[in-house]
Amino acid sequence: MFLTLIAAIISFMVSAFTMPYFIKFYQLKKIGGQQMHEDVKQHLAKAGTPTMGGTVFLLVATAVSLLVSLFSIKNTQSLALISGILSIVVIYGIIGFLDDFLKIFKQINEGLTAKQKLALQLAGGLMFYFLHVSPSGISSINVFGYQLSLGIFYLFFVLFWVVGFSNAVNLTDGIDGLASISVVISLVTYGVIAYVQSQFDVLLLIGAMIGALLGFFCFNHKPAKVFMGDVGSLALGAMLAAISIALRQEWTLLIIGIVYVLETSSVMLQVSYFKYTKKKYGEGRRIFRMTPFHHHLELGGLSGKGKKWSEWQVDAFLWGVGSLASLLVLAILYVF
C-alpha cells in the first residue's frame, strides 16, 4: 500500500510538471490542434487546443509503475500480471497515437479509418489474450460469484471487452475533464477491489495511473489547455478492461463503467433509430439532441429540451453517476 501511494505521488508530480512543457512545445511548433464539432457552438473556441496529452500521462504511469514495481515484485506471476496490463495499455496507446498523428501531422481528418482502427485493436487484443490471458488458464467469467465457463469463446469475450471499452472511453472524451476523472473514479473502485483481493501489484499500477491522470487533469479541466487524444482514451479503456479481467471481476465494469456504457449506447441507439425511421417514414428521426450523451446534456439537459448545461454541470452529473455506480458495485461485493 505504501509503494502504491509513492507511485501515485511521483506520477502526479511528474505528470503535472511535464505537461506545461508538452503544451508549450505544441504551441511553439504550431502543430494543428483538436478539431471541434460545429453542432456544439460553445466548443468552437477550443479549436487548435493541443491534444495527444495522453502521451505524457501514459509514459509517466508506465515508467513509474515499472520503476516502483522493482521493489515489490516477488515472483514471476506478479511480473506476468503487471506486464500483461501494461502491454495492452502500450499497444492501444500506440494505436491511438497513430490515429492522432495522422489527424494532426498528416492533416488526414479521419485519421485511421474505422476498419483500420478495428483491425489494429483486434490484433492488439489477440496479442494480449495469447501472451497473457491464455497462459493463465482463464476461460470463465466470474458473475456474482458464479463461474460461467466459456472455453475457447473466452477469447471472443476478451476481444469484445477490450475493444468495446477502449472505444467507449474514447467516445466519453468529448468535454473538458469528463473522461479523465471518470476513469479516475473507475480506477479508485478497482483499487479497492485489488486491495481486498491482496492484488498489490495491480494496485500499484492503478495508483500510478491515478496520479498521472490527476496531474493531467490540472490542465484538462475547463477551460482545457490540453486534451488527451485517442492515444490516452483508447489506452485507458483497454486498461480498465484488462484490470477487470485480471481481478476476475469482469461483470463489474458494466456498472463501474456505466458512464462509458451510457455514452456508447446513446450513439448506437441514435444511429439505429435514425436508420429505422428513415426507412419507415422517409426521414431520419432522433432520440437524443446529439450523441454521445454528454452533448445531449449540453444542448438541453436531461430532457434535451430544457436549459443548456455548462460543461461543469455535465461533468458533475456524469461523475456523480459514475461514483454512485461504483459505490453500488462495492456494496454488492462486500456489504450485501
Swiss-Prot record:
A GO term, aspect molecular function: metal ion binding
Keywords noted in UniProt: Cell cycle, Cell division, Cell membrane, Cell shape, Cell wall biogenesis/degradation, Magnesium, Membrane, Metal-binding, Peptidoglycan synthesis, Transferase, Transmembrane, Transmembrane helix
Domain of life: Bacteria
Topology relative to the membrane: Multi-pass membrane protein
One BP term from GO: cell wall organization
EC class (word): transferase
Stretches that traverse the bilayer: 3-23, 53-73, 78-98, 118-138, 143-163, 174-194, 200-220, 226-246, 251-271, 316-336
EC number(s) from the headed UniProt entry: 2.7.8.13
Keyword Phosphoprotein: no
Disulphide bond pairs: none
InterPro entries, per database record: Glycosyl_transferase_4 (IPR000715), PNAcMuramoyl-5peptid_Trfase (IPR003524), PNAcMuramoyl-5peptid_Trfase_CS (IPR018480)
Subcellular location: Cell membrane
Cofactor(s) of this protein: Mg(2+)
Main location: membrane
Listed pathway(s): Cell wall biogenesis; peptidoglycan biosynthesis
GO CC term, one of those recorded: plasma membrane
Swiss-Prot/TrEMBL catalytic activity: UDP-N-acetyl-alpha-D-muramoyl-L-alanyl-gamma-D-glutamyl-L-lysyl-D-alanyl-D-alanine + di-trans,octa-cis-undecaprenyl phosphate = Mur2Ac(oyl-L-Ala-gamma-D-Glu-L-Lys-D-Ala-D-Ala)-di-trans,octa-cis-undecaprenyl diphosphate + UMP
Role: Catalyzes the initial step of the lipid cycle reactions in the biosynthesis of the cell wall peptidoglycan: transfers peptidoglycan precursor phospho-MurNAc-pentapeptide from UDP-MurNAc-pentapeptide onto the lipid carrier undecaprenyl phosphate, yielding undecaprenyl-pyrophosphoryl-MurNAc-pentapeptide, known as lipid I.
Protein family according to the UniProt entry: Belongs to the glycosyltransferase 4 family. MraY subfamily.
PANTHER family, per database record: PHOSPHO-N-ACETYLMURAMOYL-PENTAPEPTIDE-TRANSFERASE, PHOSPHO-N-ACETYLMURAMOYL-PENTAPEPTIDE-TRANSFERASE HOMOLOG
Record-given protein name: Phospho-N-acetylmuramoyl-pentapeptide-transferase
Source organism: Streptococcus pyogenes serotype M3 (strain ATCC BAA-595 / MGAS315)
Record lineage: Bacteria, Bacillati, Bacillota, Bacilli, Lactobacillales
